[in-house]
Amino acid sequence: VLAEYVEKDKPVAIDKNWPARFLIGLIDKKAGSAFVNGSEIVDRVRMVKDAEEIKLMREASRLNDLAIGRVIELMQEDYDEVEVERKLSEIWEELGADGHSFEPIIGYGANAADPHHSITKGAHKKPGDSIVIDMGCLYKSYCSDMTRTVFYKSVSDEGRKVYEITRDANLKAIDKVKPGVTFAELDAAARDYITDHGYGKYFTHRLGHSIGIDIHEPGDVSAANTEQVVPGRIFSIEPGIYLQIGR
């Protein structure tokens, strides 16, 4: 049906996520002179949030902040990673969130050294373990994303040192945020600080990413992105040092 409304002598812009089976149908009917990626212009419009979007994302972050506080309280109990995830879903529902914006990461001990760890049934924490909690909720279709590190019962000297370096790197990048600064400069602010303290090789990913209706939207906070920050852009700043301390 769509082919009937397309001018065959003009290019057709296609959404980057459009299923191939639909595109093949248009190609077979020779609808349009060419097919081009139409998502870029939409993505660029979505990069800058308006006042209503910012309000919704503030609420999503507020709910997620409350939830992450309750998850940290759960660490007093002997729940495995899967049980914490189940409790988290209940917490979000109680708070009025609309579910998770991505699959949460709960990593105990050695699992916390993997930035893309999959929650493991039967994984229990023990004294001295670091615990990484990476979670986000949805609120009226808008995403939040937060990462926290806590220690169970005790923390080693190196664990405290790595935590403080990561925290300070985060603050260095946040302090640098203003209109006109590039995303590459934000990445460098955190990465250089971590590198100067001897842990650069353990910071294995970009500094952050844009957030909105999708948890990962176009516009990385990385060394490769030389675009400038402008008012209305919403993005994460999440440096990390990933190593197994004392193991």
Tell me the role of every PLM-derived stretch.
Residues 1-247:
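Active-site neighborhoods and metal-handling regions in enzymes and metal-associated proteins
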